[in-house]
Amino acid sequence: MLMTPTGQNYGTLEGAYNHFNKALFGGALPNCLITVQRHKGAYGYFSSDRFGRVGSSTETTDEIAMNPMHFNGRSIEQTLSTLVHEMVHLWQHRFGKSSRTAYHNKQWADKMREVGLIPSDTGAPGGKETGQKMSHYIATEGAFERACNVW
């Protein structure tokens, strides 16, 4: 039986989330809802407690959204690095101290470096590591690159 486009895309994203959660976060991150949504000017985003859980009036789940407009124009490693970038936001929300909405603080930047992504407002070496609108680049031979190579 052929896999549907929905099953293939969401299954791949969920498999990647599970792999990087184990490899980079020691399996500490909770399950979340991964969505595919267009969001102008962003490769992805994180939203805490975004959706109610089916069958519960009080429980919520966090969302990691990936922008499909950028899937074809970037390498699989770059796309997966966006997923991990958003996973760092989830980590900070659950285990750290977030700053104001959309601000990427020093704690976030330190965790990014720990998982093998270098924060940069330009997406290249030499950029600011904290701020409102942030990107990153992949650390050569860092934890993310090693985990990506075995995925």
What is the meaning of each model-derived region?
Residues 2-74, 94-151:
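Metalloprotease/metallohydrolase-associated module, dominated by Zn2+-dependent proteases
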Residues 78:
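Glycine-rich, basic loop-to-helix element that forms the pyrophosphate-binding segment
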Residues 81-94:
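Active-site recognition of the HExxH zinc-binding catalytic motif
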